[in-house]
Amino acid sequence: DQHSQFSGICNPKGRLLASFRVFHCGDSYYLCLPSSMIETVISRLRRFMLRSKVTLEEASDTFVHLGVSGSEAEQALRNVAGTLPDNIHEVTQNKDQAIIRVPGIHPSFEIFTTTEQARQLWSSLNVQSAPVGSIAWQFLDIQAGIPMIFPETREAFVPQMANLQLIDGVSFTKGCYTGQEIVARMQYLGKLKRRMYRARCESTTQPLAGDEVYVSGEGTQSVGKLVSAAPHPDGGYSMLAVLQISSAEGKSRLHLGSASGAVITLEHLPYPFPSE
């Protein structure tokens, strides 16, 4: 009850169908993921219910979902919500509210609560905090190197390509799960040729999940794919992209959409790659 888990679900070939955060509240487990992925996950999980005494349903109307982040976020939230989780992924909760501490460049919390409590929190936090849209939270996920799978990237990556092994998002010791053989083989026997990088781009149009990445002078052969993208407060766009390691760490420029598209500049993730 005091721990959440960032995770994913794979197809038999070990490719990610979705990524999400799992937490327990009351007598249920909840998965937090993009609304566009709900039907995919429900349809997949229903295959494994068999005769189990389990119900599976969309829970979008169960909670109001809020995010609070910033250098003063912890104290501001503590003043109105009381006890907060101390460590990343930990959860504090009562019968109808859960607060999860999540990775971020600043202290960051996700809150799942009732409509009435959400109104009270919003009113109290709005005194010193600035309300922003969900796209701003997507930017924070990108800065933290947290990959969310969307319909455009469904089944495009094995977990290691999206860095799940670096953010405690995949287990190599637990029991069977779909695609486990492929995922384990990649971890212990394979050589990873693609992984996820954080990047910046001054594109004149909004980059989208699934957009292709190219290298200068290499024609129409894509070397990677965007995982997610969001406007950067200082202009341009911040992105996560799964790229060929050889291309990302080579000397040629990376471009969005075509070999002559907007230039992509790589940035450091907040966690190291194993070789670093």
Can you name each region flagged by the protein language model?
Residues 1-19, 23:
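Acidic, proline/glycine-enriched N-terminal capping motif
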Residues 2-3, 84-92, 206-212, 251:
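Glycine-centered loop/turn motifs
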Residues 110-200:
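Anionic-ligand-binding alpha/beta catalytic cores of soluble enzymes and soluble regulatory domains
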Residues 162-170, 184-276:
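Glycine-rich, small/acidic residue-mixed loop/short-helix segments
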